[in-house]
From Swiss-Prot:
CDD domains: ABC_MJ0796_LolCDE_FtsE (cd03255). InterPro entries: AAA+_ATPase (IPR003593), ABC_transporter-like_ATP-bd (IPR003439), ABC_transporter-like_CS (IPR017871), MacB-like_ATP-bd (IPR017911), P-loop_NTPase (IPR027417). GO terms for cellular component: plasma membrane. The keyword Transport applies. Keywords: ATP-binding, Cell inner membrane, Cell membrane, Membrane, Nucleotide-binding, Translocase, Transport. GO terms for molecular function: ATP binding; ATP hydrolysis activity. This is Lipoprotein-releasing system ATP-binding protein LolD. It is found in: Cell inner membrane. Coiled coil: none annotated. Belongs to the ABC transporter superfamily. Lipoprotein translocase (TC 3.A.1.125) family. It comes from Blochmanniella floridana. The lineage of its organism: Bacteria, Pseudomonadati, Pseudomonadota, Gammaproteobacteria, Enterobacterales.
Amino acid sequence: MVNKNINDIPPILCCSNIIKRYQYSNFSITVLDGITMSIEYNKIIAIIGASGSGKSTLLHIMGGLDKPTSGDVFLEGRALNKLSDKDCSIMRNTSIGFIYQFHHLLPDFSVLENIAMPLLIKGLKFAIAKHKAQFILELIGLNNLCDRYPCELSGGESQRVAVARAIINNPPLVLADEPTGNLDESNSNNVFKLLEKINLWYGTTFVIATHDLSLAKKCHKIYIVSNGMLKISTI
Ligand SMILES: Nc1ncnc2c1ncn2[C@@H]1O[C@H](COP(=O)(O)OP(=O)(O)OP(=O)(O)O)[C@@H](O)[C@H]1O
């Protein structure tokens, strides 16, 4: 029998020399200027940086929502940026969950339906999707909200529902863009505790772009984006 060393496990996500340039009518800017990084399984990683430094751009490229100008992103060993739009979208739906600052819940659907939505998009029957969504809601202690609509939720509740929706497919990777950006300290702590629980229960890897330094300090590792480059923080 071959004993696998923990160091033999490949990273869940690798960025290799990512460059991203935006071209405007008479000039261009280089937002990311050669980002190389590896993210290990089961970690909670923070990406911090000044406003406009490129955190969201990097997260979008990591999730296949945007393509780099050059360089590669490998998700579980597959070059995401080289996949066709169709294959990239399949990989996104199966392997990545997304959480946004303003949660992006669908206003005309109940909490339960919002959480079930990624499964319905995948083609699961409503009864099965509903059952799974109920299970997740119970697991994270939000079952009392299942019939409410997004306009009937507080900011913290909305964000926890968005977390539930991001993990319903049990993706190995969740990318979160300012997940606590519009929340007060107590709600922000609650959302982070939820991410920590999910990380422990399922081994989900989280990459969080944030301005919130106290949240970043609770993560396993902090990267700083500055002048298009990335460095590991020693804070
Ligand atoms: N689709 C786009 N087209 C052109 N320029 C863009 C686009 N998206 C972002 N930018 C520019 O790229 C730079 C980085 O933006 P990005 O949103 O990644 O920064 P950020 O660090 O996430 O900022 P914030 O913390 O304010 O959300 C900014 O100068 C922004 O204006």
